[in-house]
Amino acid sequence: MRFCFLLAVLVSANALSDEAAHARKRWAESPYGPMLERILPPTFNAAHLPEAGSDGAKLARRYCVQCHNLPNPAMHEPARWPRVVDRMVVRMQGRGNMGTLMADMMAGVEAPSDEERIALLAYFRRNGQAPIDHARYPELERPSGEAFRLACSQCHVLPDPRRHTASEWRAVVARMQQNMQWMNRVVGSHPIQGEPQLRIEEINAFLAKYAKR
């Protein structure tokens, strides 16, 4: 019985992987591929998804990669995800803010059912970014918290340091540095006087000080 269960999980995972690969190939080869490819960075993949075996994670792998790279649930705080998911579903249905161009771009794209949309939203909200409580961390306004505050607020709400351990944070920060380089955000590879620089050591030090134990 256990073998049958594991086999079913493996078959399901392979099917989702094939589905995702097919979807990525479709949009990458479309006339709009270069634009779709730039929507989200490619550094987050299925192995990084929280609750990887859950229905929500499967729905994310099935639907979200039809138009762009896989989103990280932590890219938005829970309160923001309803607006984002609703907007994405409208676009998958061939509607949205680009008229006939949107319909053309979404040709062949499958939209989730109402039940799937609810499950997908619940998954993203459950694993969304927990915003930092500024009152709990007065160091944010001190020089030692500046590097973290300035760098991380460029793309999302400041995360609560208790979300990860210090070692986990180092891996997250390394991935975020790749994202910022990909998006042409401030990375500080060539310091220029007067421009803000990405200070990785200071960011990791701040996060390690308050990280989950």
List the predicted regions and their residue ranges.
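C-terminal capping alpha-helices of c-type cytochrome domains
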Residues: 106-135, 190-213
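Sec-dependent signal peptide recognition
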Residues: 1-6
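The canonical Cys-X-X-Cys-His
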Residues: 61-70, 120, 148-159, 203
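Electrostatic cytochrome c docking/interface patches
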Residues: 23-58, 126-147
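Extended, hydrophobic interaction surfaces within ordered domains
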Residues: 18-22, 78-127, 180, 184
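Gly/Gly-Pro-rich "capping" loops immediately C-terminal to redox-active cysteine motifs
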Residues: 55-57, 69-94, 154-182
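Inter-heme linker and motif-flanking segments adjacent to c-type heme-binding CXXCH motifs
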Residues: 71-76, 126-139, 158-167, 209-213
